[in-house]
Every structure is written in structure tokens, then in C-alpha cells.
Amino acid sequence: MNAHHLRKQLRQQRLRLSKRHRNRAAYQARRGLNRLQHPALTGKNVKIGIFADAFGEMPTQPLMDWARHRGYSIYLPVVTGKHQPLVFIEFTQKTWRQSRLPKHPLGMRQPEKGKMLNVAALDVLFMPLVAADKIGNRMGMGGGYYDRTLAKAKSKPLKIGWAYDFQLVEKLNANPWDITLDALITPSKLWLFRRYLVSKE
């Protein structure tokens, strides 16, 4: 199956899920967060990039609640232009619920103002995806925002995918410019793609 048809099929499959199924999957996946060990998650003033789900992705509210409980600073990606890298604006207590955020013309919710960082300043970045494979290749929505943003970064955060189990496929045909994941968290498993990551059982 080519990339276009795979992307279309998996996006449709996500959209068919009930709200109850989505929320249950997200809370099951949250358990994988507690098994992930990395220095980026244990330092002081940890800055984490988290996307606001808008296109049928596994809900990120449990992920944000986890980060808040751990005392991490949360930053949401913001699109500033079609061919521009993403910037990240702090998601504060005043704008905690995603439903209160303004909606971008592309469909996702994002803050309009706040403390802004580029991706190199983040310690960890949770990335949306349509599909990932068992060696960490990632297929996004097709806009290339994350690939462009990370390609230009002088340093890169720990890159973690957040997705349903059915979004994991055996192998993707990766392009040279595609940014790979360091780890993937699904409802049933924590996948580690880099040797320096450790799973705490």
C-alpha cells in the first residue's frame, strides 16, 4: 500500500473510534509514561512539547495531566506560516483545557500568546502521527511541519510518538527528510527505538 492510501485508511480508522474508546486508549497509554526513563525527564525545569489532538489522534489530555502532575512546563506547537517551522507557546493554568484554545484555520487548537520557545529549547517532544513502524520511522499528516521544524534545530529534544496500537505498522517507506522517533507509546506497549532509552518494568 502506498503512503497516500495508508495515510487515508488510518485517518479514517481513527475517526471511526468512539469517544469512549479514544479516552480509554489514552489512559491505558499513560501507563507507558511511567516506564520511560531518560535524563530529559528527570532534570529541573523540564520543558515538554505536547500537541492538542484535533484529527482523531489519541487524546492528549491524560498526557498533559501527567506532565502537570510531574511539574513539567507544557508547550503547545503553533503554526505561524505554511512553510515556517513550528514555535511552541507555554500552556498555562489559565488555558488548561484544550477546548478553551482558539482554533487555527487548519483545524487544530493552539494558544495565541504566551512564553514562546523554538523546538531546540524543549527537553521532550510528543509528536502526532498517522503511522509509525517498528524501527521508529514516522508518517505524519503530510504537511511536513514537524520534519521541517526538527531538521532546522541545532539540538533536538527526545522525540516520542503517541498513538493507537493499530497505527503501528511493520515497515514504512521513509523519505530522507523524515524525522524518526526515539520512542512510541501505545495503549498496549512502550516501544523504544534508541539504545539510550530504558524501560522501567
Descriptions of predicted regions:
Residues 83-201:
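Conserved phosphate- and dinucleotide-binding cores of soluble alpha/beta proteins
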Residues 1-118:
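N-terminal active-site beta-alpha-beta segment that forms phosphate/nucleotide-binding
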